[in-house]
């Protein structure tokens, strides 16, 4: 989530928030509290992975914010699966694949 003076800046901050490491928190205590409130609230809905139901719908919520004028507020939200944006796969000459960033995943199974 990005919160800023304009929607353009909010969109940029939202992308920055999406790329933060999972489990990190905003340095601002109020923003960190809002991250936790949003994460708990979204998980309480019970959507689960891919909307199939379950206890957890999100792995985390990150908020990046900047100073803004009280009369305007730009908010942008980026959503993305962690596995879609972080990973490194190595192929050998026989096209065997190894995911060195996710050691528990066997791509050749």
Where are these regions (language model features)?
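Non-transmembrane, aqueous-exposed alpha-helical and coiled segments at domain scale
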Residues: 3-109
């Amino acid at each position: 989530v990005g919160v800023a003076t304009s929607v353009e800046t909010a969109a940029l901050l939202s992308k920055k928030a999406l790329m933060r490491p999972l489990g990190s928190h905003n340095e601002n205590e109020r923003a960190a509290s809002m991250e936790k409130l949003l994460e708990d609230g979204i998980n309480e809905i019970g959507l689960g992975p891919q909307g199939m139901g379950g206890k957890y719908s999100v792995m985390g919520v990150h908020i990046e914010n900047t100073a803004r004028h009280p009369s305007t507020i730009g908010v942008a939200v980026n959503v993305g699966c962690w596995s879609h944006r972080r990973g490194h796969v190595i192929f050998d000459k026989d096209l065997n694949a190894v995911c060195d960033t996710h050691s528990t995943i066997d791509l050749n199974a």
